[in-house]
C-alpha cells in the first residue's frame, strides 16, 4: 500500500513547473517558528546518531505542557503515524467514524481489514456532531474516531457531549480516539480539550506540531 499524507506539492511542481497554492493541509501560514529553526540547526551535529527511541526528554517536556504523566505520552512521526500504529496495535474488527471527516482514519482501519461504519452528519444541522452519534455506538464497535474540531467541517462537539460519547463507548467496550490536532487554533482551546477525561481509561487523544506550529516537514505528533 502506498500511503500519501499531505499535499503532493512536489508532484505538482514536477508536472507544471511551478509551486501550487496548497490549501489541502491546513498548516499555519506563519511558517516554522524561529526558535524551532534554531533548535534544528543546533541539533545537526548529532544527526549521525539515532534519536532516543523513547523520546524521554521530549515526553518529559510534553508532560509538563499538557499536565499529564510522561508515561501516558507516546510520540510518533506526526499524528497520522500514530493513527496507523494505534489501529495496527488494536486491530479493531468494526469501527465508527463521522462523515465527512479526516480520510486517514478509514484508510488506517481498512488496512487491517476493519469494517468502517460512517455516521453521516446532516447538512441541516450544519454538519455538527449531536447526541444522535451516541446511538450509533454499540457493542461490537471496537473503536470510534472523533475529530475535534472536525476536519473538514470545522465543527466542534461540546465537551459535555464528548463526555457522553466517551461513557457510551465505555459501556460498549469501545476505545474512543479524539483527534485534537486543530484544537489549539481556538483561543479558548483549554475549555474544549478532553484531557480531563483521560482517567476513564478508554480514551486516546491525538495531537501534533504539524498544523499550529507550521512543522509539517518535521513529522512530530503525540498521543
Which residues does each PLM region occupy?
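Active-site pre-lysine segment of PLP-dependent enzymes
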Residues: 110, 127-140, 152-176, 180-215
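Conserved beta-strand elements of the Class I
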Residues: 21, 74, 94-96
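N-terminal "arm"/small-domain region of PLP-dependent enzymes with the aminotransferase-like
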Residues: 1-49, 174
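PLP-dependent aminotransferase class I/II
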Residues: 31-33, 54, 202-223
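Short loop-beta-helix segment that forms the pyridoxal 5′-phosphate
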Residues: 51, 63-85
Amino acid at each position: 500500500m502506498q500511503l500519501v499524507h499531505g499535499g503532493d506539492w512536489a508532484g505538482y511542481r514536477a508536472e507544471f513547473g511551478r509551486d501550487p497554492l496548497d490549501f489541502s493541509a491546513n498548516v499555519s501560514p506563519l511558517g516554522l517558528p524561529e526558535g524551532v529553526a534554531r533548535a534544528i540547526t543546533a541539533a545537526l551535529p548529532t544527526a549521525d546518531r539515532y534519536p532516543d527511541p523513547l523520546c524521554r526528554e521530549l515526553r518529559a517536556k510534553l508532560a509538563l505542557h499538557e499536565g499529564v504523566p510522561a508515561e501516558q505520552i507516546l510520540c510518533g512521526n506526526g499524528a497520522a503515524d500514530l493513527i496507523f500504529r494505534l489501529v495496527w496495535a488494536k486491530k479493531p474488527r468494526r469501527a465508527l467514524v463521522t462523515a465527512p471527516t479526516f480520510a486517514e482514519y478509514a484508510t488506517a482501519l481498512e488496512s487491517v481489514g476493519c469494517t468502517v461504519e460512517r455516521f453521516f452528519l446532516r447538512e441541516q444541522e450544519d454538519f455538527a456532531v449531536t447526541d444522535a452519534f451516541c446511538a450509533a455506538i454499540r457493542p461490537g464497535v471496537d473503536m470510534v474516531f472523533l475529530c475535534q474540531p472536525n476536519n473538514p467541517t470545522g465543527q466542534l462537539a461540546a465537551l459535555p457531549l464528548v463526555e457522553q460519547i466517551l461513557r457510551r463507548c465505555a459501556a460498549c467496550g469501545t476505545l474512543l480516539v479524539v483527534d485534537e490536532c486543530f484544537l489549539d487554533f481556538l483561543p479558548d482551546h483549554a475549555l474544549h480539550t478532553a484531557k480531563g477525561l483521560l482517567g476513564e481509561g478508554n480514551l486516546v487523544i491525538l495531537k501534533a506540531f504539524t498544523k499550529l506550529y507550521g512543522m509539517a516537514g518535521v513529522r512530530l505528533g503525540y498521543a
